[in-house]
Amino acid sequence: MSQSELRQVIDAETAEPGWKSLYKVGGIAALIMVAFPLAEVAINFLPGVAGLSQGTVTVIDWFTLFQNHSFLALRNLGLLNIVGAAFLAPTILAIYSALRRDHEAYGAFGTILFFVGLAVYLAGSRAFPMLSLSSQYAVATTDAQRALLAAAGQAMLAEGQSRAGIPLIEFACLVISTVTLRGRVFSKATACAGILGNALLIIVEIIATSSGGLPNAGFVIAICGGLSLMTWYLLVGRRLLQLGRT
């Protein structure tokens, strides 16, 4: 049996009618995911963004940024990561569906890890609670109200922007990519791109956590990991759309 004939058989086995819509949604979501790292970089180069971001030192600075540039404030507190993780959810479900015939247990393990990581990350996000506090601060009528809201915002900033769920999400995607390497549905190139990208970003998280920042070498690793993940999104998205059309 030729390679193309084998692929047709695999597609026929995998693309059950009830799952085709999920494959299409997951494929489109994966392709959209490519835009998020590009948007993150593009925003950094917009005029005035660097100055506004560096000016957020106190909680009042943050409230002012929220009132004048709410999108930038949300973005600085991880908005694109939040939206990106949400977009990745249907893609992970679609990958699990494609893998369930041959590797259901490991696929389910990776999928569960992903959603646990997503829940932890969303629960620890400071973006929307800070937006709510800034809105209340803007309409507060007494000094006591403003002082109370400022104290609540300061406590939130003191806790820091939680990234506890991000390494878990990356590890889940690493598990899923490893499973695809052993399966027949996705190409080896797709699996390797996912393994490399997620492994590198896990290393970046470890470096950033242990050193309290990201040295130049860490930025290089992050760029390589980001490019690998973008490649993974493209390859996964294309393959899922193929399954959705079968």
List the model feature ranges, each with a label:
Residues 2-246:
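Hydrophobic, aromatic-enriched alpha-helical segments typical of multi-pass transmembrane helices
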